[in-house]
Amino acid sequence: MINSQNTLYLQTKPYWDYLRIEKQASQHTLSNYQRQLLAVSDMLSQAGISTWQEVNSATVRWIIAQSNKQGLGAKSIALRLVALRQWFSYLIRQEKMSVNPAVGIKAPKASKRLPKNIDAEQIGQLLTSDSHEPSDLRDLAMMELMYSSGLRLSELQGLDLGDMDLAGREVRLLGKGNKERIVPIGSKALEALNRWLAVRNQFKPQDNAVFLNKRGGRLSHRSIQLVMQKWGEKQGLESHLHPHKLRHSFATHMLEASGDLRAVQELLGHSNLATTQIYTHLDFQHLAKIYDAAHPRAKRKKQDDD
């Protein structure tokens, strides 16, 4: 059990007042830093270190190694390192240290997880609905649009009526970094949107948001996440449904069908092609079968190669 009364952690008390009052740090930042420095203080105390001035770059590397051994993820270790850097910077400003031992030390890189996607059969199961309830028409339209056009959750949530050109079958999106892009709307999504917009006024709109809550206001990010989760459960989807999964499925299916990485990059609004390239690793068996069938020198012999 971590001891919050250890000498090292007690030395950090003025730092929290400094962050709260002078730096106006959020409670979220304070809680994160406090949790990290408490854990490090305990680790160092058990190693016989009683002052922060005893910590050098070798000690910081040891902290990272110990954190890794304890099963801490790469992102958590990176946060721990940031908390240490900021704490040592404070001690330098207070003239209690002359060198920041955490500067120049890198946290381990997080392994890139392949996005999970829903296969075409499951998409059909998910997006099949005979309900005429206004809220169901809204929910189906959201999911059809996200899968049809690869929207981010923030893009879907921020969508206004003026952003859509239904006659031209396209939608204008404001993505990360306020970058604007225009993407096409598929026929199924267009049908679902028209059905929803026909009943949208029943929600007594308070603004121009495309997707409204029952009070007529814009649906929140969290509400959209909950709507999709419940819809997935209702439709019998085995895995947990969240907005990113629909975007990932759009990207995967588009890439499998077209093989055009640049086009998928444009549709997703990725500024860096490397971000899109993660989808090239998806469904390797599917791609390998295409390669075996198409490449003239890909015919594999049953016997072992020498």
Swiss-Prot record:
<feature type="active site">
    <location>
        <position position="244"/>
    </location>
</feature>
<protein>
    <recommendedName>
        <fullName>Tyrosine recombinase XerC</fullName>
    </recommendedName>
</protein>
<dbReference type="InterPro" id="IPR023009">
    <property type="entry name" value="Tyrosine_recombinase_XerC/XerD"/>
</dbReference>
<keyword id="KW-0131">Cell cycle</keyword>
<feature type="active site">
    <location>
        <position position="176"/>
    </location>
</feature>
<keyword id="KW-0238">DNA-binding</keyword>
<dbReference type="InterPro" id="IPR011931">
    <property type="entry name" value="Recomb_XerC"/>
</dbReference>
<dbReference type="GO" id="GO:0006313">
    <property type="term" value="P:DNA transposition"/>
</dbReference>
<dbReference type="InterPro" id="IPR044068">
    <property type="entry name" value="CB"/>
</dbReference>
<dbReference type="Pfam" id="PF02899">
    <property type="entry name" value="Phage_int_SAM_1"/>
</dbReference>
<dbReference type="GO" id="GO:0005737">
    <property type="term" value="C:cytoplasm"/>
</dbReference>
<dbReference type="InterPro" id="IPR010998">
    <property type="entry name" value="Integrase_recombinase_N"/>
</dbReference>
<feature type="domain" description="Core-binding (CB)">
    <location>
        <begin position="6"/>
        <end position="92"/>
    </location>
</feature>
<feature type="active site">
    <location>
        <position position="152"/>
    </location>
</feature>
<dbReference type="InterPro" id="IPR002104">
    <property type="entry name" value="Integrase_catalytic"/>
</dbReference>
<feature type="active site" description="O-(3'-phospho-DNA)-tyrosine intermediate">
    <location>
        <position position="279"/>
    </location>
</feature>
<comment type="function">
    <text>Site-specific tyrosine recombinase, which acts by catalyzing the cutting and rejoining of the recombining DNA molecules. The XerC-XerD complex is essential to convert dimers of the bacterial chromosome into monomers to permit their segregation at cell division. It also contributes to the segregational stability of plasmids.</text>
</comment>
<feature type="active site">
    <location>
        <position position="270"/>
    </location>
</feature>
<keyword id="KW-0963">Cytoplasm</keyword>
<dbReference type="InterPro" id="IPR004107">
    <property type="entry name" value="Integrase_SAM-like_N"/>
</dbReference>
<dbReference type="InterPro" id="IPR011010">
    <property type="entry name" value="DNA_brk_join_enz"/>
</dbReference>
<comment type="subunit">
    <text>Forms a cyclic heterotetrameric complex composed of two molecules of XerC and two molecules of XerD.</text>
</comment>
<keyword id="KW-0159">Chromosome partition</keyword>
<keyword id="KW-0233">DNA recombination</keyword>
<dbReference type="GO" id="GO:0003677">
    <property type="term" value="F:DNA binding"/>
</dbReference>
<feature type="domain" description="Tyr recombinase">
    <location>
        <begin position="113"/>
        <end position="292"/>
    </location>
</feature>
<dbReference type="InterPro" id="IPR050090">
    <property type="entry name" value="Tyrosine_recombinase_XerCD"/>
</dbReference>
<dbReference type="Pfam" id="PF00589">
    <property type="entry name" value="Phage_integrase"/>
</dbReference>
<dbReference type="InterPro" id="IPR013762">
    <property type="entry name" value="Integrase-like_cat_sf"/>
</dbReference>
<dbReference type="GO" id="GO:0009037">
    <property type="term" value="F:tyrosine-based site-specific recombinase activity"/>
</dbReference>
<feature type="active site">
    <location>
        <position position="247"/>
    </location>
</feature>
<comment type="similarity">
    <text>Belongs to the 'phage' integrase family. XerC subfamily.</text>
</comment>
<dbReference type="GO" id="GO:0051301">
    <property type="term" value="P:cell division"/>
</dbReference>
<keyword id="KW-0132">Cell division</keyword>
<keyword id="KW-0229">DNA integration</keyword>
<dbReference type="GO" id="GO:0007059">
    <property type="term" value="P:chromosome segregation"/>
</dbReference>
